[in-house]
From Swiss-Prot:
Assembly and interaction partners: Interacts with uroplakin-1a (UPK1A).
Gene that encodes it: UPK2
Record-given protein name: Uroplakin-2
Species of origin: Sus scrofa (Pig)
Keyword tags: Cell membrane, Cleavage on pair of basic residues, Glycoprotein, Membrane, Signal, Transmembrane, Transmembrane helix
InterPro entries hit by this protein: Uroplakin-2 (IPR009952)
Length: 184
């Protein structure tokens, strides 16, 4: 004899799926960490939606942490040129690397603040959304806290003086050589 418990919980499971389904994410927004950060003091760099959504109408939703106000920005998803990464290496040669930045810049943000960012992309009759990811802007540094040491300027002055003295000695030597050569 089968237990009636699964039959009673089936409507509950279906209701939960119906409620949670609109928040399900179809794609992820990639972020970058390490030597290059997508966070600036008053803006953030967000990776563009995936290539299969090229030509779709994207709405970027930015919500400040602990706030219900959502700022929306709409744009058309640009075409893909190669792989869609936040930073991709275009060319790498002897001693240099050319990179391309494929990102959307969110501007006019408050320094040192956490934001939640997500996409909603409509292409034709289909709509896809991204998972909401947290990103933070960098705090603004106090100008008085920045050290005003000699840094590079002292070295530049020394090199300039040495080169000036060497050039003076070279010109004096050249004039002396011309004068001694003309006397003979």
């Amino acid at each position: 004899m089968a237990s009636p418990l699964p039959v009673r919980t089936l409507p509950l499971i279906l209701i939960l799926l119906a409620v949670l389904a609109p928040g399900a994410s179809d794609f992820n927004i990639s972020s970058l960490s390490g030597p290059l950060s997508p966070a600036l003091t008053e803006s953030l760099l967000v990776a563009l939606p995936p290539c299969h959504l090229t030509g779709g109408n994207a709405t970027l939703m930015v919500r400040r942490a602990n706030d219900s106000k959502v700022v929306k920005s709409s744009f058309m998803v640009p075409p893909c040129r190669g792989r869609r990464e936040l930073v991709s290496v275009v060319d790498s040669g002897s001693g240099f690397t050319v990179t391309r930045l494929s990102a959307y810049q969110v501007t006019n943000l408050v320094p040192g603040t956490k934001y939640y960012i997500s996409y909603l992309v409509t292409k034709g009759a289909s709509t896809e959304s991204s998972r909401e990811i947290p990103m933070s802007t960098l705090p603004r540094k106090n100008m008085e806290g920045i050290g005003l040491g000699m840094a590079r300027t002292g070295g530049m002055v020394v090199i300039t003086v040495l080169l000036s003295v060497a050039m003076f000695l070279l010109v004096v030597g050249f004039i002396t050589a011309l004068a001694l050569g003309a006397r003979k």
